[in-house]
Curated annotation (Swiss-Prot):
Induction: Expression is positively regulated by the fusaric acid cluster specific transcription factor FUB10. Expression is also positively regulated by the secondary metabolism regulator LAE1. It comes from the Eukaryota. Pathway: Mycotoxin biosynthesis. Residues 680-921 are annotated as: Thioester reductase (TR) domain. This is Non-canonical non-ribosomal peptide synthetase FUB8. One of its GO terms (molecular function) is transferase activity. The lineage of its organism: Eukaryota, Fungi, Dikarya, Ascomycota, Pezizomycotina. InterPro entries: ACP-like_sf, Adenylate-forming_Reductase, AMP-binding_CS, AMP-dep_synth/lig_dom, ANL_N_sf, Far_NAD-bd, NAD(P)-bd_dom_sf, PP-bd_ACP.
Amino acid sequence: MQKIAKQALSSLSSLAKSPANAMGSISHLPAYGHRLLPVLIDEISRDEPDRVLFYTPRNGQPSQGYDEVTTKIFANAIDRLCGWLDSQLGSPTVSKTIAYIGQNDLRYFIIMIASTKLGHRLLLSSPRNSVEGHVSLIKQSGCELWIASSGLGHHEFLQDLHIPSVEAPELSELLDPTLAKPYIYQKSWHEGKSDVLALLHTSGSTGLPKLVPVYLETAATVDGFHLMEPTDGKRPTGVEWTGTRQLCAMPLFHVAGICLGLYSAVFFNWIVVLPSVGPIMQHVIEDALDHISLDSAFISPSVLQDISKSSRVLEKLSKLKFITSAGGPIPQSVGDLIHPRVPIMQTMGMTEGQWLASVVMHPDEWAYYYFHPRTGVEMRPYSEDLFELVFVQNPKLSATQPVFKTFPDLDIWETKDLYSRHPKHPDLWKYEMRRDDLIILSNGEKFNPLAAEGKLISHPWIAAAYLTGRGRFQTAALIYPDDSSFNNSDDTIIDNIWPTFEEVNKSLPAFAQIHRDFVKIVRTPFPCTPKGTLARNETEKSFNADINAIYDRSTHGKPSVHINGTTEDVVRSGIREAIETVSGLVDLKDDDNIFTRGFDSLHVIRLAGLLSSAFYQPLEVEPGTIYTNPTISQLSHSVWTHLEYGPQDRIHHSEVTLEMLAKYIQAFEPPRESKEHIVLTGTTGEIGSYLLDDICKNDKVAKVWCLNRSVDAFQRQVDSAKSKGLSSNWQSKAKFVRYDVTSENLGLSQDDLEEIKNEATAIIHNAWEVNFNLPLSSFDPQFVGLQGLVDVCRATRHKIRFFFVSSISAAMNWPSDLLGPVPEASISRFDAPINGYGSSKLVAEHLLSKAARSGVLSLSVLRVGQVAGPVRTLGEGSIWTRRDWVPAIIDASVHLRALPLDLGSASILDWIPIDLLAEVIGQLVVPVNPVVGQENYYNLLNPRTPSWKDTLPGLKAHLEASFSEKFEIIPLQEWINRMRGAEKTIVKEVSEGSSETARRAQSGLKLLAFFETLASETEGSRGLEWSKANALAQSSILACMEPVSSAWFDTWLTQWGY
């Protein structure tokens, strides 16, 4: 125990010193998961005063440059606001609830910490809330003061509620570096963990918003990401991205903005770049990309949807290392356009559960999540193909389960979020929908509308799509057109987009398909949640008249403005009228910024559409034009210039040029090596025979050198292939070469050696002594042969891709209860092998790893599990060899007329048939998408794992039909005892030659000690799990492999003559 404790302390010390976890010059060991934000901010401001937390755009405009906000300035701003709050509320002798609503800037984070320091509760009500929503939250929270940034303070409902309102200090005032009066938060962890950081609220998508308190303890669970062990070498995203400079283009009052804005800067040492003020749209991202260097950007799916339609912005986005998104699923069509240009990393969060720890995925799996095991989530079946994400409280995971800080009385919290499992990787999950997103038609049929909506919005004329039909006989669609098509007639738009509907209908079940008569164009944007996703229930209510119109075959019109563009003054007057029409703003001055007066993204879209149809000559006013010209004077001048001189097409010309470059650039890339030349050792063995057959069928393989020790290997190979039903038509590719591990240059002739050195591209080392009883010292000849192959690699013209067929026995003693699943990585514990054979494989892995790291070769280690008999090849010799332990159990069971109820610790059947294993290895050796890296490890086990009990009924039925006798099913230990009791009878019958079943059962007697070992460990007692992500990613055959089944057992039993 003392040794374990010392190791644990050593690990903690290493963790504290590692760059990914270090907090600058702070010398003490951080209490990750128990750090109070107000204390931590003051601490790092003292110890690291010059560390940059944020970049904020000067005067809210990136074009004016950015101001650095260091820890010292941030902490000082918090103290300054504490003083201001004191002046408004008096000394904090009594905790009060205050509300803040403001421009999307750093003041949100400043007031959160300041109110917490003073013991007050801060309500953050979304600016998008309806009056009814604001009033409900004020009443729920007991709000006593409404604070707003300039231009957002006047709300009539506050007077009705007798709630005073006050304007917040400007951000520039708060960031003044002049030292403010310090306000010290002196509470310990236990004293302060229940203090409220902020009162957030649900989206209100299913009714009025409900309060969700975020406690300091809740925030600290995100800090607990530091405590999570790496998974396949990756830490949770927050820790993995330490030190990155990321644009946080999210609303800062929302949990997504708080997590990836405030928490990421303070807990994880990110440098967070805040967006320009105003609605977060495509131009906000582009402004930041144009004016500050970034590593990444955090962008909502709705904005990514707009970006995907602009080749100009996509080109700028491609300069980032990656982009992050959250708040909802990215439509497949949008992600498919973006991820070839820049990797997409999705994160998942929720108001009640903050930031859900996930691990960085391969860019090709951008649509999926890998949730870290320490989140304590379970995926519970909901319907045939859908699973619900459910949090299950686990006291051991207290520091990393925020949802149970929000709901401390719950043991289980159902998120109502539904996911589908990755078809190849069982631990990857794709978000599909909310439970209440399902549409149930009047005939009881139900379907998921989100995938269809995602395909629809891929059309450039569609900005948003909403499918409906709850309680109706037919699905209907509301379409909100994109800016580019907004001023077209409904019929024109439907004509243009209908081919996309036809494609969508192909993916929908017949009962859910959309008829042309059930499509309606709407000119008002759909209601959205604060995170930018479609608010389905609110949309259903808000567009009830339009929905009824579809079914009633009625239509509606829209307002219009007409502008005679003869002079710039006339244009200015018309634009003023248009702004008044869409927003109701009647007292605007020509130089007033419309966004500081309450203009939002919905107003922009309506104004753009209105102006695009307002003139007597063709004109398209894009939303971006309004954002970059936010005053009447600026907008009228831009429109007048367009009318007078025509559009400037330089940007369009640039986009066309880039598209032409992209079209032809691949033709000018250097050609890749098209054919493989492979050295394969041990082809006459069981695996080797099937492997030779598979790789010789591959058109990408030009030549195979078959290295065997026997002088008659060729004839043996031909006989084996014919017997097994394999092709022997490989002579044109295969060359048989005898080799000797004890001789110089492996005993190869000079011609053969030179040929291999000049032509070989890969080596598959399959030959190895298979004997589980030998000690490690007996495997010296194997290591001498391995050294000879590595020496060959040193002299080859091509860098050899070396595939070593290893074994899971190299890690069967892996302590998975302490270290988790056996990784697809180098095994550093030399007590992991189960026997001398496994030790020899582990030593070989390490020797080859040394060669790979020295640049001699690139290594792929293939850890093979239980190899079962073939299931596809039907030759007479195509049989599961009776020397194996599974056939031995069957032969013994036939003699006893009894089958064991379980196989003890081997009851989980992760077996791979030998012919399918050869195909899996073939995919790894000749991959569709080559893997980059000096070392790759693959655990080759069947990803689908039934138990022995699952196959037992079919096995029993087959044997009973074959022998016309009943077979018992008895516990494994009883079965072993019966075998021991039958030993004398079996030996006697074998000696007399009177019983074939006794002769076969004799092999079971030889393995009784092994069976005793299985019985001593009950089913699942070992708890050994194997990571398979790498293998599943590279082999579609393994990923789609069927589980061991009764049908497979029927094949094997037939092979054995039963």
